[in-house]
Design a protein with these regions (language model features):
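Short intrinsically disordered terminal tails
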Residues: 1, 160-165
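N-terminal glycine-/charge-rich "phosphate-binding" loop or analogous flexible N-terminal tail
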Residues: 1-9
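Cysteine-based protein phosphatase catalytic domain of the PTP/DSP
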Residues: 8-94, 115-150
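A phosphate-binding catalytic loop at a beta-strand-loop-alpha-helix junction
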Residues: 92-111, 115
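Histidine/acidic residue-rich metal-binding segments in metalloenzymes
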Residues: 155
């Protein structure tokens, strides 16, 4: 696991990627980011508490922190956060989900939200990977295969539940 500094390095460029209309994933917010310029109603911050930087939140906008460690295992709250994001999008809100690099934690939460909204796991994974693209270092979104396997198992589990009498 890479250790990143508490604040972004000088010249840090925050990046946002539209996965579908009303759902964006992104990298760590740059210090001093003006929430109003992001074009979103809700920011869902998945960074560890020690890394989080909270922007000034204008009236009518929402900032939510669901800290998730940058580890190889899927955080237990991922499913609940994804359902919440899907409900926000369903109510017409535009949501930005971000972690440090906008790859794995943001990717698994966004993909699971897409599944809640009716996409297959394979489609959700492909869409997140395609829309996020590679980092400058060549890392893909959802490069953590444990996260991909979890998403596929979530679909298999929900399919089994639908078929149960």
């Amino acid at each position: 696991m890479r250790q990143l500094p508490m604040t972004p390095p000088p010249g840090w460029r925050m990046e946002l990627f539209e996965v579908i209309p009303h759902l964006l994933i992104g990298t760590r917010l740059a210090s001093g980011t003006d929430y109003a310029t992001l074009g979103v109603d809700v920011i869902v911050d998945l960074e560890d508490w020690e890394w989080a930087w909270v922007p000034t939140v204008p009236i009518g906008k929402v900032y939510l922190s669901f800290p998730m460690a940058d580890e190889d295992e899927v955080d237990p709250k991922t499913r609940d956060v994804a359902h919440f994001i899907a409900s926000l999008i369903g109510s017409g809100r535009t949501v930005l989900v971000h972690c440090t690099e906008g790859l794995n934690r943001s990717g698994v939460v966004a993909a699971r939200a897409l599944m809640v909204m009716g996409r297959t796991a394979t489609d959700a994974i492909s869409l997140v990977r395609h829309r996020r693209g590679l980092t400058m270092d060549g890392f893909p979104a959802l490069g953590n295969e444990a996260f991909v396997e979890w998403l596929l198992s979530e679909e298999a589990g929900s399919d089994a539940n639908r078929r149960a009498p």
